[in-house]
């Protein structure tokens, strides 16, 4: 049986590597080892200078030091962790978790046999809890820098020439000039602006402003039905705002599988969030204490003007390389201002590499982290690896949404013969006992080999459950392989096992 699995997995691994997302290039591993020519000569020159202290940058810096490279990290924010830790992933999860607890206590305890009265929101305390989490984690990265002997330069970096970076110090730090044999650009991304709409972070806000509102708005309009928009919309809806999501596309959720997107719209709508899909924003301007918004439905060309207390602009992010001096060096960039690199993260100046949001691929913190490790390993050891078919994505609404691999739409477009297996959380014993059983797991497999191609789920703790699916895809597992693994009972993970069984043999046990 093992031999057949190995042969099947090897065959499908070759086939599946051709299914790269257009923006992502496959990481290639060199067979031969290189000499450690990346090491500095000991004259004050660094082996590695990482520009940017976000998830990709700080991880690259730590890994570089662990591999024996004399490393310095330059960060202009004043705190490490980048957008993710300071004004993104981490503070948003704090608000998502605490707003969910509040909403559950206020609206979902009576049926559980818990009588509660007098529940209210202390927004300032909720914001303090968020800020405390951020502060703890940012200081934790500084500790890791010291532990691993990574030097930390607080300031704004700009290339003087391909070997030299000028750093203008901030927060009392001195200006300095850094010479290094290798550079990694990890400057991340910034909020994508909407033409004609001015973000003041008070009435018209980006995700940054939405994390720090001083009061719960009565009405909030969210421009963009992607991950950021729906997460922040969920926070403020739970706290009492009337939230309307305006989405240009026919469906919400961006790149997620169509079936999961439909389930998400249905479930989130029941929570009180309104959706206006196939709708474009024509204008938005502050009018006294409110924002006047004009939109147009692209299906019937009907226009609508209304007032909202806060407008959140969440239409995505764009690479950030401002002031770095890349044009002076002649570093190649594409039309979207992304730095172009090869399979080893090298720009057209080979000793300058780039990772994360500043280059191609999904703008995800964990993708940047893996690229940071791979880029440093290419420098120090001559080989690195990131499997771009196995980058999971998670939306932390309730229920959570998570996916890895290709969607059913992508399988159709690629001409792949495939099978589908699904299993609803309403048939999962742990979800039922938790009274939290909305959603499903959907598995896509190669019809000829049973090899996993994609796993998509919406349901309780989906962000934690997707790890098993990602591991299975990484190692070329079949649906049968996962279905035959004993899963503890009662657990939410049994829903994954049952969906795998449905994909493999056509039938699950409990549905």
From Swiss-Prot:
Intrachain S-S bonds: 84-89
Keywords for the protein's UniProt record, in alphabetical order: Disulfide bond, FAD, Flavoprotein, Mitochondrion, NAD, Oxidoreductase, Redox-active center, Transit peptide
Catalytic residues in the record: 489 (proton acceptor)
Entry's Gene Ontology molecular function annotations: dihydrolipoyl dehydrogenase (NADH) activity; flavin adenine dinucleotide binding
Known function: Lipoamide dehydrogenase is a component of the alpha-ketoacid dehydrogenase complexes. Malfunction of this protein blocks the progression of cell cycle from G1 to S phase.
Protein name: Dihydrolipoyl dehydrogenase, mitochondrial
Cross-referenced NCBIfam families: lipoamide_DH
Main location: mitochondrion
Reactions mediated catalytically: N(6)-[(R)-dihydrolipoyl]-L-lysyl-[protein] + NAD(+) = N(6)-[(R)-lipoyl]-L-lysyl-[protein] + NADH + H(+)
Source organism: Schizosaccharomyces pombe (strain 972 / ATCC 24843) (Fission yeast)
Assembly description: Homodimer.
InterPro entries reported for this sequence: Class-I_Pyr_Nuc-Dis_Oxidored, FAD/NAD-bd_sf, FAD/NAD-binding_dom, FAD/NAD-linked_Rdtase_dimer_sf, Lipoamide_DH, Pyr_nuc-diS_OxRdtase, Pyr_nucl-diS_OxRdtase_dimer, Pyr_OxRdtase_I_AS
This enzyme's EC code(s): 1.8.1.4
Recorded family membership: Belongs to the class-I pyridine nucleotide-disulfide oxidoreductase family.
PROSITE patterns tied to this protein: PYRIDINE_REDOX_1
Further information: The active site is a redox-active disulfide bond.
Residues where FAD binds: 75-84, 93, 157, 187-189, 357, 363-366
Single biological process term from Gene Ontology: 2-oxoglutarate metabolic process
Top enzyme category: oxidoreductase
Swiss-Prot/TrEMBL cofactor(s): FAD
Cofactor binding summary note: Binds 1 FAD per subunit.
Annotated positions binding NAD(+): 224-231, 247, 281, 316
């Amino acid at each position: 049986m093992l031999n057949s699995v190995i042969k099947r997995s090897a065959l499908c691994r070759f086939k599946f590597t051709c299914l790269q997302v257009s923006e992502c290039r496959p990481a290639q591993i060199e067979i031969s080892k290189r000499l450690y020519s990346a090491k500095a000569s000991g004259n004050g020159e660094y082996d590695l200078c990482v520009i940017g202290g976000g998830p990709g940058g700080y991880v690259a810096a730590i890994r570089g030091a662990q591999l024996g490279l004399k490393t310095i990290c330059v960060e202009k924010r004043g705190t490490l962790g980048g957008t993710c830790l300071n004004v993104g992933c981490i503070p948003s999860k704090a608000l998502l978790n605490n707003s969910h607890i509040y909403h559950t206590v206020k609206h979902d305890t009576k049926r559980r046999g818990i009588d509660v009265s007098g529940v209210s929101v202390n927004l300032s305390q909720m914001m303090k809890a968020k800020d405390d989490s951020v502060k703890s984690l940012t200081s934790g990265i500084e500790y890791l820098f010291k532990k691993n002997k990574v030097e930390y330069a607080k300031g704004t970096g700009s290339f003087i020439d391909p070997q030299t970076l000028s750093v203008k110090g901030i927060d009392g730090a001195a200006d300095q000039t850094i010479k290094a044999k290798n550079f990694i650009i990890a400057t991340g991304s910034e909020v994508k602006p909407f033409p004609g709409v001015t973000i003041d972070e008070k009435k018209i806000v980006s995700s940054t402003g939405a994390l720090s509102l001083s009061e719960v708005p009565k009405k909030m309009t969210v421009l963009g039905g992607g991950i950021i928009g729906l997460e922040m919309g969920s926070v403020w809806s739970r706290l009492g705002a009337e939230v309307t999501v305006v989405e240009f596309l026919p469906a919400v959720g961006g790149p997620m599988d169509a079936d999961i997107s439909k389930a998400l719209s249905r479930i989130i709508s029941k929570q009180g969030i309104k959706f206006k899909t196939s709708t474009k924003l024509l204008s938005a301007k502050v009018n006294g204490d409110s924002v006047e918004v004009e939109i147009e439905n692209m299906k019937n060309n009907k226009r609508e003007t209304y007032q909202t207390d806060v407008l959140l602009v969440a239409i995505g992010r764009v690479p950030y390389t401002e002031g770095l001096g890349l044009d002076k060096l002649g570093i190649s960039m594409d039309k979207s201002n992304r730095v172009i690199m090869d399979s080893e993260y090298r720009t057209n100046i080979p000793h300058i590499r780039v990772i994360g949001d500043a280059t191609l691929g999904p703008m995800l913190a964990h993708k940047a982290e893996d690229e940071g490790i791979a880029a440093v390993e290419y420098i120090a050891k001559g080989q690195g690896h990131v499997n771009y078919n196995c980058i999971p994505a998670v939306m932390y609404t309730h229920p959570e949404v998570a996916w890895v691999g290709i969607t059913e739409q992508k399988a159709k477009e690629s001409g792949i013969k495939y099978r589908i297996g699904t299993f609803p959380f309403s048939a999962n014993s742990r979800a039922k006992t938790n009274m939290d059983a909305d959603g499903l797991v959907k598995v896509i497999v190669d019809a000829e080999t049973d090899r996993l191609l994609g796993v998509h789920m919406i349901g309780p703790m989906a962000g934690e459950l997707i790890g098993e699916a990602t591991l299975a895809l990484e190692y070329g597992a079949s649906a049968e392989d996962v279905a035959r693994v004993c899963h503890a009972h009662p657990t939410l993970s049994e829903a994954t096992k049952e969906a795998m069984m449905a994909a493999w043999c056509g039938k699950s046990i409990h549905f």
